[in-house]
């Protein structure tokens, strides 16, 4: 009987490696009100959770089949996080362009954009330090922060699996074509 290898589905994904600081501080933290997109798909709004070595949660599970396919084909998949989906890129840049006076950049991001905690941590973890000096680059990063995922979590951690007996090996009544009478 034809069988496809089992693969995790509705699962979390590992990143190439969080820094120890980020992992220690934010593992288990929910990332709320965020959008995520693969390059070829529209973004989805929701939330996910930072894990010690990656990400998981409903927003990740919704794209898990597409992410898994990208990893299988290319060895990695890059998703883009919109940390402020309720604001346009122009609105974000306008708020970043406001004078911050003696406030630190962290306080400016918090007071102008409400960007703090795990979302601010993601921005620092996944961005080159140079973008923080340029409001246009910073606004682009906030609206499309690249996160590279390198592998699915193991089968025993997945909510469900893909693979097994393919539909083309069965009749419309779900009987195995090679073994008549076996459903």
Residue spans of the language-model regions?
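Glycine-rich loop(s) and the adjacent beta-strand/alpha-helix scaffold that form part
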Residues: 1-19
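Rossmann-like NAD(P)H-binding beta-loop-alpha module
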Residues: 14, 20-38
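Residue-level recognition of phosphate/Mg2+-coordinating polar/acidic sites
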Residues: 26, 35-181
């Amino acid at each position: 009987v034809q069988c496809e290898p089992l693969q995790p589905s509705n699962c979390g994904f590992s990143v190439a490696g969080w820094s120890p600081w980020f992992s220690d501080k934010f593992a288990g933290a929910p990332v709320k009100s965020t959008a995520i997109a693969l390059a070829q798909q529209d973004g989805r709004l929701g939330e996910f959770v930072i894990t010690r070595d990656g990400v998981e949660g409903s927003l990740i599970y919704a794209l898990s089949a597409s992410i898994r396919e990208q990893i299988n084909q290319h060895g990695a998949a890059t998703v883009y996080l919109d940390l402020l989906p309720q604001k346009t890129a122009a609105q974000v840049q306008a708020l970043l362009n406001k004078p911050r006076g003696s406030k630190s950049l962290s306080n400016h991001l918090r007071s102008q954009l409400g960007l703090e905690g795990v979302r601010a941590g993601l921005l620092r973890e996944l961005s080159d330090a140079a973008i923080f000096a340029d409001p246009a680059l910073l606004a682009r990063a906030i609206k499309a922060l690249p996160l590279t995922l390198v592998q699915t979590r193991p089968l025993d951690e997945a909510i469900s699996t893909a693979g097994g007996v393919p539909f083309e090996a069965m009749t419309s009544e779900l009987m195995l074509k090679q073994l008549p009478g076996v459903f």
